[in-house]
């Protein structure tokens, strides 16, 4: 009687309020999709970076987004703002795009290796630049190593969540599954270069290859709204877990009232 009155409600509360973790063994299939931070304004794909015009498109709010395919490709879109508490007009903002291949190690670590020629960053540092009204646009390449990650259903938001742990074990902000399959630009080199000798024939050949590559990318961008990617918020698996929890709660409540 005492157990049913005091301990069953506590156990059920913990059951229904805790994150529901799945897939104990790390695998690429559980990573597949586009994962975006809580601001829900930063997404990978052509809406963030236009490789034909080499244009970074600034989102409405800061945030981060990572997309993964199940065959080892990734893309990242980062919009970060670092405030200056002493002078609010000196905030540093950066918009960063990279894509490439990732490796999932046996210990659960993630190693992201970008395509060096494709990374781009737009940096605004008004208090440390000659012209505060202008931002700096540069090539950017930075490999990344994440210590580990977890994929689970957040019971509060009811969404699939990706929790990444940085190299030092600290948590990144949680990312929520937005699209599956992922929304990404082509996984090939978007801005290829060639270091061959600069003869006329070589330059013509390289120019032709780059032109063909850009045409493929352009066609991909034209088809961006024909993607079969779906926004993933509620899933059948989560519904089963949720209704199982509701059934357990109802059963325990009935037992509690019948015993009184």
UniProtKB/Swiss-Prot annotation:
Record InterPro entries: Rot1 (IPR019623)
Residues exposed to the Cytoplasmic side: 259-260
Glycosylation sites: 87, 107
Annotated TM spans: 241-258
Keywords from the UniProt entry: Endoplasmic reticulum, Glycoprotein, Membrane, Signal, Transmembrane, Transmembrane helix
Gene Ontology molecular function terms on file: unfolded protein binding
Leader sequence residues: 1-24
Record function comment: Required for normal levels of the cell wall 1,6-beta-glucan. Involved in a protein folding machinery chaperoning proteins acting in various physiological processes including cell wall synthesis and lysis of autophagic bodies.
Protein's name in the database: Protein ROT1
Organism expressing this protein natively: Candida albicans (strain SC5314 / ATCC MYA-2876) (Yeast)
